[in-house]
């Protein structure tokens, strides 16, 4: 085994490491050879393949050997190969080589990196070195631009791969300098400086350049401009103008069709064109003056037709465009001067108000404010408005004419008390009256027929009364007198709110509790007819009817007081017998002659009570009410029983009289019947005599007449039967003839249609068959025909069928119709035989 292990066969392109134990030096043996190991030698590694580097590949060797200028290995004093410990070496494509003791391959054999066009490698120097007379210091960075193959170095590290940026039309590339450098145009740039590259195409940024963004151009049109602002002082290359920091300006389509903002230009926004028609105007605030600077606090009026861009700092007053005021004959404008100015030789002080009347067109100057547009207010004879003079404060009502407010006038709103509004809303039957009421319109009220309305003027401190039917129109300082009347039964105050006072005649109902002298408490329901006696021609009488605010409550109280006093003086039985007399005397009183007066007058407001109606009288105490009810029921029962007895006696009397008349009539009828029976017997005797003598003659005569009538009837019947048979035969013949003609024409048309159909189908089938034959071919048909018969024969033989029928799926056999046809033919034959038998019987 020792001898076998001491002989090592090294293949071509393989190597081994052998250690000499005497010198402790390791050497390399390269094949092809057969190496015999000595006793003092030891195989350290191998055999291993040599390192092979293909074309366009490389590898990295750690701790490489040292070679002299001639490329020979450098040995130390012990005969051992010197190594550069801690160093690395990149080896490119060459002959296969072995690794010397101490050398190691880092990684794998790697292909060289190819840098494509429009790309570059950013390289960094790891240590100082000189290449192609260019000295690089550790930390330096530079670009290796393609297209090329990069040969790596130990001293250089690839940081990243950089791609070129494509700059399209209407685009620019914004760059920033990472440190002081020169760009590709040779312009010196400071650290942090930004600039634009506007040339179209691919741009590969330098090693000290950073791509910030791609800036797209703004397309400018006739209707769109660009608002720019300078972030710092710079030279505007487009207009060759020095721009200061914070300056703002517009770029319009006349300057350039497209604009790419510079690095020191900030796009504030896009400004759209402002267009004015010939019927429009606008006011520009802070306009740009002739010197190009904004005139702060100034205004400029611009009229159409006009199109313009608002410059930076300019704005429209109210942010809108105004239409020119077009005034008709019935319209006007109320104007107010914002400041003192003169126009057309007329001076206006600040705060002046004046009117412009139509018809005209008007564009207000910047010194004038349009307060409002006024229209002439059309008023009927029954309509009006409240107008206040803002200088004097005087309010007046304008009625019955179209009115245009003057410059120092305004509409005045008249506020009505809530009670008045509720009454007006209730009488107008409009639930939205309060919300929809125009307070500037003169308040009107239609006084109903036979009513009175009081209006009080608080300024003049006097009132007036209007009698209906009439229209009441309130002045600025006038108000309605609202009546608060009592209502319900018994009367309660403040139940009815009204403006109009009805003069009557009318009635009111009240419930009065009274007590008789024997302490019986009664509830009286009384109705009073009332009316006002007023002379409308006298103002004093008209004012007098409104002196009592609640005439209903006061009058009912007064009448109730009189009634209670009168009832208290009489007993319950007495009052129950003559309640109407007691109440009327207590209310109306007695005249000098002792008669009851016809009315009861209230002198304070001319109210007259003309009549009293007692609707009901009920005891208040329940026991009294029950006792009274029992007595009333007892009286009713007594009266009812007496009436029943009288009715029964009268009925018996009438019944006896009727029975006597019936007996008398019966006797009379029996006498008449006896007389009739006598006459009947006489007639029976006469008829018996006549019957015995003329019976034979009558029988003979009757027999002859009967035979004659029967003969005539038979003759007539025969004639009628003959005529009927003739008519029936003729009608049957004509009907049968018409039927046969119709059947023949129908069958003829059916046959013609069938012939046409069969002809068309035959043509279609022929053309179809011809087309199929032509498409399939003669030889193919022949093969199909032969194959089909043979196959069918074999198939049927295999099935064991003795009789069969073959048809295709397109022409199925209808066995049901076949059976029906057979049955139908049999039925026709039976019908024909029956018809023949019937005709034989007739013959």
Swiss-Prot record:
Pfam families from the UniProt entry: MVP_shoulder, Vault, Vault_2, Vault_3, Vault_4
Keywords assigned by UniProt, alphabetized: Acetylation, Cytoplasm, Nucleus, Repeat, Ribonucleoprotein
Compartment list: Cytoplasm; Nucleus
Bias kind Basic and acidic residues: ranges: 646-663
N-acetylalanine modification, residue list: 2
Cross-referenced CDD domains: MVP_shoulder
Coiled-coil residue windows: none
Stretch list, region Disordered: 643-663
GO biological process: response to bacterium
Start and stop residues of the MVP repeats: 2-56, 57-111, 112-163, 164-216, 217-272, 273-324, 325-376, 377-442, 443-505
InterPro entries per record: Band_7/SPFH_dom_sf, MVP, MVP_rep_dom, MVP_rep_sf, MVP_shoulder, Vault_2, Vault_2_sf, Vault_3
GO cellular component: cytoplasm; nucleus; phagocytic vesicle; ribonucleoprotein complex
PANTHER family: MAJOR VAULT PROTEIN (PTHR14165:SF3)
Oligomer and partners: The vault ribonucleoprotein particle is a huge (400 A x 670 A) cage structure of 12.9 MDa. It consists of a dimer of half-vaults, with each half-vault comprising 39 identical major vault protein (MVP) chains. Dictyostelium is one of the few organisms in which the major component is actually two proteins (alpha and beta).
Function: Unknown, though MVP-alpha is required for normal vault structure.
The name this protein goes by in its record: Major vault protein alpha
Phylogenetic classification of the source organism: Eukaryota, Amoebozoa, Evosea, Eumycetozoa, Dictyostelia
């Amino acid at each position: 085994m020792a001898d076998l292990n001491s002989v090592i066969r090294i293949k071509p392109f393989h190597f081994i490491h052998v250690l000499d134990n005497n010198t402790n030096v390791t050497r390399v043996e390269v094949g092809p050879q057969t190496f015999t190991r000595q006793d003092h030698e030891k195989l350290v590694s191998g055999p291993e393949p040599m390192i092979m580097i293909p074309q366009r590949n490389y590898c990295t060797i750690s701790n490489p050997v040292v070679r002299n200028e001639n490329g020979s290995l450098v040995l130390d004093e012990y005969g051992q190969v010197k190594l550069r410990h801690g160093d690395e070496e990149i080896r490119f494509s060459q002959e296969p080589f072995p690794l010397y003791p101490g050398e190691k391959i880092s990684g794998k054999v790697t292909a060289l990196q190819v840098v494509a066009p429009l790309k570059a490698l950013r390289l960094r120097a790891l240590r100082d070195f000189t290449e192609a007379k260019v000295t690089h210091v550790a930390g330096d960075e530079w670009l290796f631009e393609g297209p090329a193959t990069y040969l790596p170095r130990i001293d250089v590290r690839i940081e990243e791969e950089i791609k070129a940026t494509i700059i399209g039309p209407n685009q620019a590339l914004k760059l920033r300098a990472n440190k002081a450098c020169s760009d590709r145009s040779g312009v010196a740039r400071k650290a942090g400086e930004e600039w634009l590259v506007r040339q179209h195409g691919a741009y590969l940024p330098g090693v000290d350049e950073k791509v910030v963004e791609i800036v797209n151009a703004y397309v400018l049109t006739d209707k769109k401009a660009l608002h720019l602002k300078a972030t710092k002082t710079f030279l505007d290359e487009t207009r060759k103008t020095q721009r200061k920091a914070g300056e703002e300006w517009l770029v319009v389509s006349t300057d350039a069709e497209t604009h790419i903002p510079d690095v020191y230009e900030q796009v504030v926004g896009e400004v759209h064109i402002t267009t004015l028609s010939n019927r429009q105007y606008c006011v520009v605030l802070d306009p740009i003056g002739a010197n190009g600077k904004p005139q702060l606090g100034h205004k400029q009026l611009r009229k159409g037709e006009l199109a313009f861009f608002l410059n930076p700092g300019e704005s429209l007053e109210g942010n809108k465009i105004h239409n020119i005021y077009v005034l008709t004959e019935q319209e006007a404008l109320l104007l107010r001067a914002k400041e003192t100015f003169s126009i057309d030789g007329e001076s206006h002080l600040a705060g002046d108000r004046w009117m412009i009347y139509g018809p005209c067109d008007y564009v207000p100057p910047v010194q004038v404010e349009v307060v409002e547009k006024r229209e002439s207010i059309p008023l009927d004879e029954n309509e009006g408005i409240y107008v206040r003079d803002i200088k004097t404060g005087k309010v007046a009502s304008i009625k019955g004419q179209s009115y245009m407010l003057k410059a120092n006038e305004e509409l005045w709103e008249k506020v009505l008390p809530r009670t008045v509004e509720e009454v007006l809303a209730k009488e107008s039957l409009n639930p939205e009256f309060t919300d929809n009421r125009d307070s500037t319109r003169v308040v009107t009220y239609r006084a109903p027929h036979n009513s009175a309305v009081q209006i009080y003027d608080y300024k003049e401190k006097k009132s007036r009364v209007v009698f209906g039917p009439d229209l009441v129109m309130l002045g600025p300082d006038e108000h309605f007198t609202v009546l608060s009347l009592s209502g319900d039964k018994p009367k309660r105050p403040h139940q009815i709110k009204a403006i109009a006072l009805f003069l009557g005649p009318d009635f009111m109902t009240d419930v009065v509790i009274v007590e008789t002298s024997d302490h019986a408490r009664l509830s009286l329901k009384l109705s009073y007819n009332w009316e006002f006696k007023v002379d409308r021609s006298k103002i004093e009488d008209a004012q007098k009817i409104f002196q009592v605010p609640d005439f209903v409550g006061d009058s009912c109280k007064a009448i109730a007081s009189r009634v209670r006093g009168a009832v208290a003086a009489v007993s319950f039985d007495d009052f129950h017998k003559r309640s109407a007399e007691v109440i009327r005397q207590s209310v109306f009183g007695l005249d000098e002659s002792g008669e009851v007066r016809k009315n009861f007058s209230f002198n304070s407001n001319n109210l007259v009570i003309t009549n009293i109606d007692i609707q009901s009288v009920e005891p208040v105490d329940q026991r009294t009410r029950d006792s009274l009810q029992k007595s009333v029921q007892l009286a009713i029962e007594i009266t009812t029983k007496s009436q029943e007895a009288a009715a029964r006696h009268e009925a018996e009397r009438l019944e006896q009289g009727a029975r006597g008349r019936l007996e008398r009539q019966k006797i009379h009828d029996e006498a008449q019947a006896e007389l009739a029976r006598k006459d009947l017997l006489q007639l029976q005797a006469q008829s018996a005599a006549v019957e015995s003598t003329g019976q034979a003659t009558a029988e003979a005569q009757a027999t002859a007449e009967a035979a004659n009538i029967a003969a005539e009837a038979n003759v007539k019947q025969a004639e009628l039967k003959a005529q009927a048979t003739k008519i029936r035969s003729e009608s049957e013949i004509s009907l049968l003839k018409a039927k046969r003609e119709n059947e023949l024409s129908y069958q003829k048309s059916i046959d013609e249609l069938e012939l046409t159909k069969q002809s068309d189908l035959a043509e279609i089938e022929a053309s179809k068959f011809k087309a199929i034959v032509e498409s399939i071919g003669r030889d193919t048909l022949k093969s199909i025909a032969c194959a089909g018969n043979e196959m069918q024969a074999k198939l049927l033989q295999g099935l064991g069928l003795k009789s069969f029928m073959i048809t295709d799926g397109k022409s199925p056999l209808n066995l049901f119709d076949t059976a029906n046809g057979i049955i139908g033919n049999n039925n026709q034959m039976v019908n024909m035989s029956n018809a023949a038998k019937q005709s034989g019987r007739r013959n």
